[in-house]
Amino acid sequence: MPRRRRSSSRPVRRRRRARVSRRRRRRGRRRRR
């Protein structure tokens, strides 16, 4: 069970970082406008 939780935590953190990077880029463009 602990090994499956670690595997699920790795893909979940990568998806969260990719979404945050895209949201931060959109916020910077809106603030410049």
From Swiss-Prot:
Transmembrane segments: none annotated. Keywords: Chromosome, Developmental protein, Differentiation, DNA condensation, DNA-binding, Nucleosome core, Nucleus, Spermatogenesis. The keyword DNA-binding applies. This is Protamine TP16. Residues 1-33 are annotated as: Disordered. GO terms for cellular component: nucleosome; nucleus. Testis. Protamines substitute for histones in the chromatin of sperm during the haploid phase of spermatogenesis. They compact sperm DNA into a highly condensed, stable and inactive complex.
